């Protein structure tokens, strides 16, 4: 019985080991993010609301996928946090803020190192350079939190080319002085061209979804088959040991019956002698 239990436990650990790569397949830099990021709320509360922090903002952060901007954005966050750290004293009143920022700098530096180890080779970068901007603590650390959340689910991009260029046809911000005009009607040829471009972009999107599905299947199927094989081996082992266990129980019962018979015979002899 103990051998059977040991085999079952071994099968369970084997399945956990086989599923381990599946669990860690998401978030290539997830283990670099520590619980120190939770102190951001405390830091924002300690800083003046009108305090301005300089950050070179990466264009397209709000409209492009995370793998398009995360590598460059985290480098700029590292620079800004290091500058902010230098403005706080490592003593007395500034100790709390200094300690929090110092921990955040270490996290960001680890993420920069992780991105250097996992570079995105097939990503076409935008020609626009990061733009220096001034942010309040709330907005700055909002960008910081968005970058951290992106790292938690960041994965290596598929081998297909991934466009990371902001469309030049994106509409500029509306000016309040602009008057309302009649809608502009496209000629039939231009409208047809736009429909073709739209269908092409839809095909690209569907292809990217299919690629991600294939990647997931490539990881999940081996783990599933290993699970089935493991349980099959466990069932065969149990079936093989079951007759032995049955014979052991039967032999034990026979021995107990023989012992009872011998005891009764001894008692009869003693009674006859008396």
Curated annotation (Swiss-Prot):
**Pfam family for this entry, one:** SCF
Question: Which GO BP annotation is one of this protein's?
Answer: positive regulation of cell population proliferation
Q: Where in the cell is it found?
A: Cytoplasm; Cytoplasm, Cytoskeleton; Cell membrane; Cell projection, Lamellipodium
Predominant location: cytoplasm
Instruction: Give the function comment from the record.
Output: Stimulates the proliferation of mast cells. Able to augment the proliferation of both myeloid and lymphoid hematopoietic progenitors in bone marrow culture. Also mediates cell-cell adhesion. Acts synergistically with other cytokines, probably interleukins.
Which residues are annotated as modified residue Pyrrolidone carboxylic acid in the UniProt record?
26
Tell me what PTMs the record reports for this protein.
A soluble form is produced by proteolytic processing of the extracellular domain.
Recorded family membership? Belongs to the SCF family.
Organism of provenance: Capra hircus (Goat)
Q: What is this protein called?
A: Kit ligand
What gene, per UniProt, encodes this protein? KITLG
Q: How does it sit in the membrane?
A: Single-pass type I membrane protein
Cellular-component GO terms for this entry: cytoplasm; cytoskeleton; extracellular region; filopodium; lamellipodium; plasma membrane
Topological domains, Extracellular: 26-215
Which UniProt keywords are given for this protein, alphabetically ordered?
Cell adhesion, Cell membrane, Cell projection, Cytoplasm, Cytoskeleton, Disulfide bond, Glycoprotein, Growth factor, Membrane, Pyrrolidone carboxylic acid, Secreted, Signal, Transmembrane, Transmembrane helix
Which InterPro entries would you find in this protein's record? 4_helix_cytokine-like_core, SCF
Disulphide-bonded residues: 29-114, 68-164
